[in-house]
Amino acid sequence: MTAASTLVRAARKSRRLTQQQLAERTHLDQSSVSRSEGGRDAEFSTIQRLLAGAGHRLYSAPTRRDDAATVAAEIREQLSVKDKDRALRALLQLNDNLVAERGLVRGVLGLAEPESTKDPVWDAAIAGLVAWRLRQEGLPAPDWVNAPSRHFRAPRTLDIDPADPDPSGIGSARRVRRAWCPGLA
């Protein structure tokens, strides 16, 4: 998927629109929406039109780093081929991207609501990471990070590897530090 296709799809999904509904709003045929979301090269004016139909607008930001919506699409792709290691690497890269930016540029990286990864634990991890890093910079978190579908009542792990220890028996952050980094306890 190209960056533009990810943006169009995420914008449409964030407004809970079908491709047909977006096509009707933009006076395009549904196949044009599908091609644009599928990564086919679309003209800039078509991308602008589709984003506007979903109530979004394309802006330029002074960064080359991927935003949360783009990273979520990468995570979804890696999970679909059962590659949790690469999915985790993408999540870590999102963290690095957010930490590398300051002020409003950091906020821009978390602004657009990502499409679901199709795994609620990963969706919650993305939301939690974005909320944490934006608040760390004194920025408000976007509404999508507080959606009930992106939260769990009890702590969960990403379950990357079956050999990963179960953290449920460790009750405090201090014990976590002891368990994982004895020198820091």
Predicted regions and their residues:
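Alpha-helical residues within the helix-turn-helix
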Residues: K13, E24, G38, A52
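Short basic helix-loop element that most often maps to the first helix and adjoining turn
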Residues: T6-Q21
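Charged, low-complexity intrinsically disordered regulatory/assembly segments
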Residues: S116-A185
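Recognition helix of helix-turn-helix/homeodomain-like DNA-binding domains
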Residues: H27-A42
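Key DNA-contacting residues within the recognition helix of helix-turn-helix
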Residues: R9, S34-R35, Q48
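Helix-turn-helix/homeodomain-like alpha-helical modules used for DNA recognition
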Residues: R64-L129
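Short amphipathic helical patch at the helix-1/turn junction of helix-turn-helix
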Residues: T2, R12-S14, D41
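DNA major-groove recognition helix of helix-turn-helix/homeodomain DNA-binding modules
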Residues: F44-A61
